[in-house]
Amino acid sequence: ILAAMSSFRNLFLATFLLAVSSIGGSAQKMRLDYKVEANIIAGGGEYTPFYLMNNRGGTVSFTPNTGYLRAAVMKDIDTTRRFSYGFGLDAMASYNDDVPAYIQQAYASLRFLALGLTVGSQEEYSLLWDKALSSGGWVWSGNSRPIPQVRIGIPEFVNFPWTHGTVQVKGEIAYGRFVDDKYQRHTHGAKENYTTGLLYHRKNLLLRFGKTNKRFYGIVGIDMAAQFGGKTYKGNKLVLDFPSDIKQYF
């Protein structure tokens, strides 16, 4: 175990130093956030307790006696500017997990006024609730690794015109692709059906009524997520081929 953790530590240091050196020349002109994290979970039983895995973005393995090392560098969007950008690179090395090392987050974001665009894999949280107090929504929860996607819309509440701040709106639309084809084939391909090339879609729209500095305000909205496209196999035999032309995107 110690030898494995030592090799993970060396890998992390190399990844972190590479990330820092690649943007070090611009560090004085922007605010960068750096993070280095270690996590170890030990115990008996067949699985890791759910409350230790919940809202962790798939970083904690369901197998017991596991751990990881994590290093990240990020720049947040500056909401005080008309135009701003952000990015993130988050690498992980794990012990007693299916994958020994992987990129957890890699994304770039642009913001112009209220409009936002994000491309890549970024951890997401509940649309409304405090991420530390909620186990997630019925539609989506943060218990799996981020899905590579393109997301565009109004990511934060903004005042709706002509309402004097009593009505705010936010909403986004996203398309992405699942990247667990090899994992599905390896774990299910021999005896069970598995799907490759699966696509992802999500859209939401929320309206907030009342001013947040008052005692009461209300929120109504809709949130929808779906999987579409892809091909289902059993072994090497094609079972189903789901359509993924332009009609399915809408």
Show where each model-derived region lies.
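Transmembrane beta-strand segments of Gram-negative outer membrane beta-barrel proteins
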Residues: 28-67, 78-89, 171-175
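Outer-membrane beta-barrel translocator domains and adjoining extracellular loop/strand segments
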Residues: 46-53, 98-102, 129-136, 181-190, ...
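Extracellular loop and loop/strand-boundary signature of outer-membrane beta-barrel proteins
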Residues: 55-59, 90-94, 134-140, 188-193
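Signature for the C-terminal beta-barrel architecture of outer-membrane proteins
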Residues: 155-250
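Residues that define the transmembrane beta-barrel architecture of outer-membrane proteins
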Residues: 61-69, 100-104, 143-153, 197-203, ...
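Residues on the lipid-exposed face of transmembrane beta-strands in outer-membrane beta-barrel proteins
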Residues: 69-75, 106-112, 119, 150-156, ...
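Transmembrane beta-strands of outer-membrane beta-barrel pores
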Residues: 38-46, 77, 91-95, 112-114, ...
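Short loop/turn motifs that connect adjacent beta-strands in outer-membrane beta-barrel proteins
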Residues: 28-33, 75-86, 111-115, 157-170, ...
